[in-house]
Amino acid sequence: MIANIDTSLIDWSRAQFALTAMYHWLFVPLTLGLGVIQAIMETLYYWTGNEAWKKTAQFWMKLFGVNFAIGVATGLIMEFEFGTNWSNYSWFVGDIFGAPLAIEGIVAFFMESTFIAVMFFGWEKVSKRFHLASTWLTIIGASLSALWILIANAWMQYPAGMSFNPDTVRNEMFDFWAVALSPVAMNKYFHTLLSGWIVGAGFVLGVSCWYLIKDRSRDFALRSIKVAAIFGLVASLLTAMTGDGSAYEVAQKQPMKLAAMEGLYEGGNGVGLVGIALINPEKTHYNDGVEPLLMKIEIPKMLSMLAERELDAYVPGIVNLIEGGYTLKDGTVALSAKEKIAKGQLAIQALANYRKALKAGDQQAAALHKATLDENFAYFGYGYIKDPAELIPSVGMTFYAFRIMVMLGGFFILLFLVALYLERKGKIADCRWMQWVALLSIPLGYIAGQAGWIVAEVGRQPWAIQDILPTSASISKLDPASVQTTFFLFLILFTVLLIAELRILVKAIQKGPEE
């Protein structure tokens, strides 16, 4: 592992990866959501034989194709960054992290890449049934791509199914299904997939309402609104349900992230869920005694219910997690951060001693050092932490991002519910205020998604892999100036791609569907 690394290299490497990931996530959710919607529309065409549904599906398919292509380009760049900027990470866990990504490339990506050609160019060339199957297989392939990538990400949040090999200084997978089917992975996948469906439904609803505002393609717009409103409402409700499951898993596996999400410094029994509050700017240290939240409005005991499924359950705060001493569910006493750091340093030293003993041919000493390493490996990453305060993520960023995500999630439930009601009553074509609300709401789904990823990734700092490998020990030994240069090159490239996509989408929307 790297010692005495330049902190600016860490910051710029993180910034570059965050830039790539956030730009990439501007394209992925629309692919996931719009793809399913166009497949539903083509299914309606297949069932009814109504040519109007065919033309509707073909229009949204054009927009899907543009977005899909640029999403692939940004995703490839992100995968290469693991090797260029995060070589220590790649070495330490490449055997595990690489497996889901390999499956994604070999199975899911090839699947969607194969059938997307039939989906776009197979109209009138293959049977209706085969074309419909190709459309669904393209969307299933895209969804499977997301599955394997999110399994890899979930493993970083909750490393399972692996063991550490001190001979190679690498983690090795021993239980594939523990990695692939961990509760964190499943909750993360469905929550993320469904949030993409919301983006797709919001996009279709907003664009369709624009046609109503312009008094164009009325029948097309009403057909699209019907599908988008039903699909969006179902997706919004399911997203809320999976969000509850995700919060529970965070409480079990990443309690510091949960504490940051709630701005909770002092835990207790029957803790309330903060609805609205402001972070106190005078709070500068976890144990300075300053009240962390201002103007707090909370739901009594609800955080305990979300975290432990009991109204009076104990939920630790940041101070409790740093200082330890509280009783865990298994009856043991929680270690303090200093105790974990000491155990981590012991594990790192035991690894070094083990390798020295092997080199010297002292098998007995090697066995003793390996036993010490195994006993303390759960805290291996803490050995790289110098100050317990480093274990606290950005509370302000995590706290506000979580509330933005949740509030927008509630907004979309209401938006799709009202849209569906007006559509069923035959009033949405004349409801100008609703049309404008839907149109202006298109960016909100993207904002909610970005906020969710901020909660997930900023909230788990300082860890690249929870408790095992901190971000500071994961990077490649590069010149910070080179990372700065590529950061701005990528910023320009991604911005150009985004502008190009927006221009193409706007032109296609302005042209409208074939009548």
Descriptions of predicted regions:
Residues 48-66, 92-98, 102, 122-140, ...:
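Membrane-interfacial loop-to-helix junctions in multi-pass inner-membrane proteins
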Residues 67-137, 154, 458-462:
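Membrane-interface helix-loop-helix modules in multi-pass inner-membrane proteins
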Residues 152, 234-342:
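Aromatic-rich transmembrane-lumenal/periplasmic boundary elements in polytopic membrane proteins
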Residues 1-22, 49-56, 80-102, 154-190, ...:
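Membrane-interface interhelical loops and short amphipathic "cap" helices
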Residues 390-453, 484-508:
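C-terminal substrate/ligand-recognition segments
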Residues 65-74, 136-156, 232-243, 354-358, ...:
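Hydrophobic alpha-helical membrane-insertion segments
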Residues 117-125, 130-136, 147-156, 173-176, ...:
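Internal alpha-helical transmembrane segments
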Residues 2-47, 55-59, 64-71:
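N-terminal signal-anchor module of multipass membrane proteins
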